[in-house]
Amino acid sequence: MLNLFILLLERVGLIILLAYILMNINHFKTMMSERDKWRSKFQLIIIFGIFSMISNFTGIEIENGHIVSSDIYYHLSKDASMANTRVLTIGVSGLIGGPWVAIIVGIISGLCRLYIGGADAYTYLISSIVIAIISGYFGHQTIKQNTYPSIKKGAIIGAITEIIQMGCILLFTNNLHHAITLVSFIALPMIIINSLGTAIFLTIILSTIKQEEQMRAVQTHDVLQLANETLPYFRSGLNEKSAQQAAEIILKLMQVSAVAITNKKDILTHIGAGSDHHVARKEIITDLSKEVIQSGKLKVAHTREGIGCHHPNCPLEGAIVVPLYIHNEVAGTLKFYFTDNNIISTSDQQLAKGLANIFSSQLELGQAEMQGQLLKDAEIKSLQAQVNPHFFFNAINTISALVRIDSEKARRLLIQLSQFFRSNLNGARNNTITLQKELQQVAAYLSLEQARYPNRFNIHYRIDDQCQDALIPPFIIQILVENSIKHAFKNRKKNNHIDVDVSMKQDCLSISVQDNGQGIPADQLDTIGYTTVTSTTGTGNALVNLNKRLTGLFGTTSALNIQSSQSGTTVSCLIPYKSSKEEHFNESVNR
């Protein structure tokens, strides 16, 4: 029995080794994070199907309670049986991929075992399917929660599935005496090995995922810290002063030898190694930077030749160069240089890419602000382009606090913040946007607010289907929702509700935002939306600005209508209905 235990341990070691190799392949890691998708399930079926065949063909031949051979077998004699790790592969496939993956892998494994033959070979097809259903059930529960079974739970399930296997051997045998002899010899080693193998398999998966999450958390924290300190500079545009200030901060906080920022032609700043010949106000001298500007794609160099600096004494041996964009056009580059090309990591590349995206957004916002001031409708444009700095820094601080607690949630909120800024930028370019885009902007804003104040409020939408393509002024619903959150519920932490209603009213679009808050004082009701007020919670300037935009675009008939009592406040307006499809048609005709 001890000899059997050692031989089975060798077989489990082979499967575990393959699992470890797979978990260090980026494609497999991505697939594991998308287990609920059929594409990933199909790939898991292929992988575990191969594992199950390896488990079958590397089994140990048993006959009359003795080990006959541990060679690779394709066929067994009619009286022989086999001890293998087939149950392990089926069980783990179910715990990871769910019932469908497990059942198909179980059928593949069972048919493979049936092909090998031996005593009561059909029994193993039946047991494979039963084990697949049981392990798949437990796997389905964790997939719904986007988690994995604990190591302890996996070990218990591994033992249970092997016990079920032994039960099937005894239940479906044609020779009970032979089955009892077989089970008494293989049961204990196989139960222990299967339980241990399942636990080790899950340990590899969980430890790899934890390591990835920790790395993402560190990366996100680094990006946020750098973004928080460098954001003010790029709002003024891509120039020598802003580039110099940002590069100094990046060099201080990152493990790089030099930092450079360029526009499309000239070096704006270069700080660190190589600054004796990589000089600001001179033309770009590296071939790598020119390639990035031309292609618009991130590039990495691991040699001096790859960088393309032709100075004979240049100390730079590696570089990461990322394009900076303004309105989908390359405006310059952000460059990280290294004097040791062996320390360039994937995390450095991701960090550079993330910073470049944030800097590009800030450059776009800054340019939009400058352009807005030059337009005839500067007042409306500037109102639309406003991004509350307090809201932004509060959002950054909230995400920073979540990074080490829940990195996945922090990542989602960072995406929402990016969406929020993108919507602000789009709003700065247009007097109107579709209702659908406005609701996406509201959703991005609410995600960030809910992160700061969990379960503080609920929002309900009643949107007519025919209104989805309607054109409305940017931020109109967001401002009204934000106003309710900030003012209506300031003294109450629960049972707060906001209702957003958009419907057709004759030829106009009716927009209404209602809350069940404390209401507006009667002495302020007539002035809200027209003049600023003195208050500890705000001045009402957002509603004044919104009212000016509405009346400026559509006339006084579209001014805000505010009704308030102690049971809540309703703010509504009527604007002429115009469809984005109609607008697109008119533009096509005018061309």
Curated annotation (Swiss-Prot):
Segments forming domain Histidine kinase: 363-579
EC number(s) recorded for this UniProt protein: 2.7.13.3
Keyword Membrane attached: yes
Protein known as: Sensor protein LytS
Disulfide bridges in this chain: none
Membrane topology of this protein: Multi-pass membrane protein
One Pfam family this sequence matches: His_kinase
Catalytic activity: ATP + protein L-histidine = ADP + protein N-phospho-L-histidine
GO biological process: cell wall organization
Location in the cell: Cell membrane
PTM sites of type Phosphohistidine: 390
Keywords for the protein's UniProt record, in alphabetical order: ATP-binding, Cell membrane, Kinase, Membrane, Nucleotide-binding, Phosphoprotein, Transferase, Transmembrane, Transmembrane helix, Two-component regulatory system
Alphabetized PANTHER family for the sequence: SENSOR HISTIDINE KINASE YPDA (PTHR34220:SF7)
Organism name: Staphylococcus epidermidis (strain ATCC 12228 / FDA PCI 1200)
Keyword Nucleotide-binding: yes
Gene giving rise to this polypeptide: lytS
Molecular function terms from GO: ATP binding; phosphorelay sensor kinase activity
GO cellular component terms, A-Z: plasma membrane
